[in-house]
Amino acid sequence: MQQVWLNGQARHTNTSRLPLRSGRSLLDCYSTGRTNAQDESCRLHGLRASMTKPLRILSLGAGVQSTTLLYMMVEGEIERPDHVIFSDTGWEPIPVYEHLAKLEKVMQQHNMPFHKVSAGNIREDVLRTDGSRVALLPTYMKNPDNTKGMMQRQCTAEYKINPAMKKHRELVGLLPRQKSKEHLATTIFGISYDEIQRMKDPPFSWLRNEYPLIDMKITRQMCLDWCADHGYELPPRSACIGCPFKSDHEWRLLRDTMPDAWDDAVRFDYEYREAVKIRGKLSSTPYLHKSLIPLDQVDLRTNVEKGQYSLFGEDQFDQECEGMCGI
């Protein structure tokens, strides 16, 4: 038996029974002459050895559904997570960051470890013209022959999913690209019943996905009702300021309720076209709005304001973003 420090605590363990993937035992980790890479491998191996059950990790987007899920955990209606992760793109509206700061205090009060991860500021990164690689945004494209298209989306993976998965690996003790057949973690997603099409299989065999709101058949509106009934402040909409997936309803909300964010989106719409032109790698012209005109020139009036009668009521099918960024 040997005393080994795992997660800051002294534990007595038979180190010869904790094999590393290389075939060495954990006892070898405490010998001399190790490289930095071997040190990291040993640290992560010790972390995995200390786990008694898979970690429960809440993917927090700070929007309506994931916020409601967090509050339900606080109220004891859903099993609490071991960790909470928020992927910060650096380009959320100010009210979202203010809301996130309040959630951080709630998590502190209830001893929920919180991790804010980031791959950088997406707005600044995609405007670079120094020849370095930049992620593609799912902008609407006007082709030279005046046909329409849509650019491939890379922003979600690079600024949302990858940073979160990197933190997942760190928490369960896996190196980059390291595989495991063990169930090491479960990611809990705040996806509501009306967004059931967003359910996905986990990308790795050591990971499971859980969708409590879908299991309980709770819709987005029911989340808002739950927050109101329990005395919680209604969460803001969480999405990058210049996300092209916004509906006209959401662009109107941004313009009418967050004028600074709207002005930022309008500026970015012009700046992004200029950056793409300078880089010279695309023959098509990008736009944030599906109309293929600058955002500040788009007619965002409702059907009623346009004098167009809708059988199902005003903009019945244009009320909510489906949040298809995947988080």
Where are each of the predicted segments found?
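Intrinsically disordered, low-complexity segments enriched in serine/proline and basic residues
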Residues: 10, 19, 25-26
